[in-house]
Amino acid sequence: MSEQLIERIRNKDQLAMNQLYREYIGLLSSVCYRYVPMEDDVKDILQNSFIKIFTSISALEYRGEDAFRNWMVRVVVNEALLFLKNRKKLQYTDVGTATLQQIADEGEPEIERLSSAELHQLISELPDGYRTVVNLYVFEGYSHKEIAKLLNKSENTVSSLLQRGRKKLKTILEKEGYV
């Protein structure tokens, strides 16, 4: 992603917008599916996200491709969270940082042995709220404090939800035969 392409988007160049869309739709779709499993909902969220990206890009200071990609991912995550809040299905739960060890209790080494694909599959079986918090913690790297702020909950609430989420994930592990 070049600064020149971003400048063209700032100047409302439709071809540049299409190029950005084509380059990042795969990544942003997979991020969105972590939070919302329904294809139609994902399409709506991505449409809103790209509108926000294209309208906000003029105020963005370009700091390299990685920073730009991370900014777009944050836009999609925020739009997905807003969608879930508006549906009033959030039941907030599991929280952590970015490794399997961080969501596993000492007595749950089976979580640490899962591949990333297996973990994604298991987390996708969690209810919306649980899935949202697990994704924020494990895959997006948010801290308890950041999740609490994002979801408008106290840190203590987020911590207790983490424990319940771990139990729910362990139940799924047992059901799927991992334990």
What are these model-predicted stretches?
Residues 59, 73-94:
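Arg/Lys-rich amphipathic alpha helix in sigma70-family domain 2
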Residues 10-18, 29-48, 63, 155, ...:
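Short, charged helix-capping/linker segments at alpha-helix termini
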Residues 23-26, 34-35, 135-142:
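Short helix-capping/turn signature of helix-turn-helix
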Residues 30, 44-51, 55, 66-78:
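Structural recognition of an alpha-helix C-terminal capping motif at a helix-to-coil junction
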Residues 1-27, 124, 145, 171, ...:
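N-terminal module of bacterial RNA polymerase sigma factors
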Residues 10-11, 50-65, 87:
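Sigma70-family region 2
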Residues 2, 90-116:
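Internal acidic/polar
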Residues 81, 130, 139, 145, ...:
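DNA-recognition helix of helix-turn-helix
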